[in-house]
From Swiss-Prot:
InterPro entries: Ribosomal_uL13 (IPR005822), Ribosomal_uL13_bac-type (IPR005823), Ribosomal_uL13_sf (IPR036899)
Family: Belongs to the universal ribosomal protein uL13 family.
GO molecular function annotations of the record: mRNA binding; structural constituent of ribosome
Source organism per UniProt: Nitrosomonas europaea (strain ATCC 19718 / CIP 103999 / KCTC 2705 / NBRC 14298)
Keywords assigned: Ribonucleoprotein, Ribosomal protein
Gene3D superfamilies, alphabetized: Ribosomal protein L13
One annotated Gene Ontology cellular component of this protein: cytosolic large ribosomal subunit
Functional summary from the UniProt entry: This protein is one of the early assembly proteins of the 50S ribosomal subunit, although it is not seen to bind rRNA by itself. It is important during the early stages of 50S assembly.
The keyword Ribonucleoprotein belongs to this UniProt entry's keyword annotation: yes
Name the record gives this protein: Large ribosomal subunit protein uL13
Any GO BP: translation
Subunit structure: Part of the 50S ribosomal subunit.
SUPFAM superfamilies, A to Z: Ribosomal protein L13 (SSF52161)
Superkingdom of origin organism: Bacteria
Length: 144
């Protein structure tokens, strides 16, 4: 018996739409990262992008548990001495509703060229509409 290895041109990438209304941030991000990597498919190969496209709608209705809305901090740096900025989940979610989910999923994907290709297959929208109707995405229920 030979070991199977998927070839990039043989992989079929499907489109799915996920409704993030009242879903917990980390659990939803873990399920999305799993799908983006393609680990749910029997043809999963670590060095080939076997994942699907995921369209997330209603990202503005995402939630976190406990006191994380005030306690969870996001950091960025300007590159200058003393140029560190911090913001809470609540502030970031109000200003950029899609960014907390994007950062959570990105942190769960591999770092390097393959991970960068995987994150490009994630489309996140704050409202309940998206411009990907032509791809006919299938609804995907994630119990998170």
């Amino acid at each position: 018996m030979k070991t199977f290895s998927a070839k990039p041109h043989e992989v079929r990438h499907e489109w799915f739409v996920v409704d993030a209304t009242d879903k917990v941030l980390g659990r939803l991000a873990a399920a999305i990262a799993h799908r983006l990597r393609g680990k749910h498919k029997p043809i999963y190969t670590p060095h080939v992008d076997t994942g699907d496209y995921i369209v997330v709608i209603n990202a503005d209705k995402l939630r976190v548990t406990g006191n994380k809305a005030e306690d969870k901090k996001y950091y960025r740096h300007s590159g200058y001495p003393g140029g560190i900025y911090e913001t809470t989940f609540k502030k970031m979610h109000e200003r950029f509703p899609t960014r907390p989910l994007e950062k959570a999923v990105k942190g769960m994907l591999p770092k390097g060229p393959l991970g960068y290709a995987m994150i490009k297959k994630l489309k996140i929208y704050a409202g309940d509409t998206h411009p990907h109707a032509a791809q006919q995405p299938q609804p995907l229920e994630i119990n998170a």
